[in-house]
Design a protein with these regions (language model features):
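A short acidic, Gly/Pro-enriched loop at the edge of an enzyme's catalytic core
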Residues: 48-59
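Conserved SAM-binding motif I beta-strand of class I
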Residues: 15-20
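Short alpha-helix
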Residues: 109-132, 151-152
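Conserved SAM/SAH-binding beta-strand->alpha-helix loop
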Residues: 22-24
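Conserved SAM-binding strand-loop segment of SAM-dependent methyltransferases
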Residues: 35-48
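A short glycine-rich, Lys/Arg-flanked "PGG" loop and its adjoining helix->strand segment in the class I
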Residues: 73-85
Length: 169
């Protein structure tokens, strides 16, 4: 993306690492952060191959990060393992019902997420705290305006990693 969410988190006082495969997007994120008087670190990386160190983040935030089905589960599990005990994974993504709207998102249903898919990806690894499917108003700039149908999922790594052996694999 272009850094809106990372900059917002930095404005709340969080240390932020924005990861994207686009150098252009990361440059825009850095420029937005500078314009708003906050700092964030950036990393150009492909989520298909990037492996963050285990237990290295307090939170992972995935906003409209749509991945092919073959990659989605592996990336979600890799990012879950990057959470420290008690860490949070927050995800918002378009649901297949988004195809009936013109407010953005992939046009390939296989790239859209359901709660069942997220539970299959992350169940047994993170504890589900919130799972929601809803229609929300979008106002994210050109091409992302109007109603959007999304899934929202919040999970927490167990306080003790041993409580979920999958975190150690």
């Amino acid at each position: 993306g272009e850094g809106r969410n990372g900059v917002w988190l930095a404005r709340q006082g969080h240390a932020v690492l924005s990861v994207d495969s686009s150098a252009v997007g990361l440059r825009k994120a850095s420029e937005l952060a500078a314009a708003q008087g906050v700092q964030l670190r950036t990393l150009e990386a492909d989520l298909a191959t990037w492996t963050p160190a285990p237990a290295s983040f307090d939170a992972v935030v995935l906003i409209y990060v749509h991945l092919p089905a073959a990659l989605r589960s592996a990336v979600h599990r890799t990012l879950a393992r990057a959470l420290r005990p008690g860490g949070w994974l927050l995800l918002e993504a378009f649901h297949p019902q988004q195809l009936q709207y013109q407010s953005g998102g992939p046009k390939d249903a296989a790239m859209l997420y359901t709660l069942e898919q997220l539970r299959a990806d992350l169940g047994g690894v993170l504890d589900e705290v919130l799972a929601q499917e809803c229609t929300v108003p979008l106002d994210e700039g050109p091409g992302h305006h109007g109603p959007g149908h999304v899934v929202r999922w919040l999970g927490q790594a167990p306080a003790q990693a041993a409580a979920h052996p999958h975190l150690l694999q």
